[in-house]
């Protein structure tokens, strides 16, 4: 059973995955309802929403972003990162893909919705196979420097983060033009406070026009913005494919 925002209901959620076509080649793990903490669709009543799975030990994860009170759930089926079997399976896949593709690092998407201690131990697990210099950058989309600082502390400085506050400073500068004080362009940014952990960006796939986090830096300012992140000593600059190729 699931619980909605107002009452406990009986629901049909699509939470069973057996992967018959794999024939257990890479994994014999089968996903069941108890490997998830929530779902975004009630098939019984054909409605979308946020439905929390009920059961022993079931709850939204702690160590996630505080937006909306608790931002564990994002969409579709929310994986339960407190379940030991889930943690073990994800760690195993992390090691597998890193070895199979001979990776030097990886980007972790939407980590504000993942339990911070899961991310920390996941990187420990992968680095146990690939070495301590295995690189990781996380997309923690929050423009508040204090939130990014707190996350960095929580995961023990084990992951770099995209400098979201810097992006928003650049967006503001491109909007205000001559009225913007360029002395503030690095104010309250990750690269100012944690230059060794900041991945500096101008735009990305989520900030471009028509996307979910639309805040596209105006075209006239982009050469200046890229000149800054590519030429300054601090931070690891990241060039957006869409800006380079159009």
PLM region descriptions:
Residues 11-72:
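Core domains of carbohydrate- and sulfate-ester-processing enzymes
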Residues 2-9:
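Short, small-residue-biased leader/transition segments that mark boundaries at the very start
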Residues 54-100, 111:
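Active-site-adjacent "subsite" loops/lids of carbohydrate-active enzymes
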Residues 10-37, 92-246:
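Active-site-proximal helices and loops of the catalytic beta/alpha 8
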Residues 45-53, 72-82, 179-186:
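Short, mixed-charge, low-aromatic patches
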């Amino acid at each position: 059973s699931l619980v909605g925002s107002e009452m406990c209901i009986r629901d049909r959620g699509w939470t069973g995955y057996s992967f018959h076509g794999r024939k257990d080649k890479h994994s014999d793990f089968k996903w069941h309802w108890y490997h998830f903490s929530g779902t975004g669709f009630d098939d019984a009543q054909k409605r979308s929403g946020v439905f929390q799975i009920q059961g022993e030990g079931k709850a939204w994860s702690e160590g996630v972003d505080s937006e909306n009170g608790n931002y564990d759930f994002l969409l579709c089926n929310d994986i339960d990162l407190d379940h030991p079997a889930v943690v073990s399976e994800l760690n195993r896949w992390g090691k597998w893909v890193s070895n199979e593709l001979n990776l030097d690092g990886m980007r972790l998407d939407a980590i504000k919705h993942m339990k911070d201690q899961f991310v920390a131990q996941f990187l420990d697990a992968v680095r146990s196979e690939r070495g301590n210099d295995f690189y990781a950058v996380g997309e923690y989309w929050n423009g508040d420097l204090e939130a990014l600082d707190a996350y960095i502390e929580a995961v023990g400085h084990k992951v770099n983060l995209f400098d979201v506050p810097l992006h928003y400073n650049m967006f503001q500068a491109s909007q205000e033009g001559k009225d913007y004080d360029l002395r503030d362009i690095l104010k309250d940014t990750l690269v100012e406070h944690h230059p060794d952990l900041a991945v500096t960006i101008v735009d990305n796939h989520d900030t471009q026009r028509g996307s979910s986090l639309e805040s596209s830096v105006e075209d006239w300012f982009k050469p200046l913005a890229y000149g800054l992140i590519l030429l300054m000593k601090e931070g690891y600059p990241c060039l957006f494919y869409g800006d380079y190729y159009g």
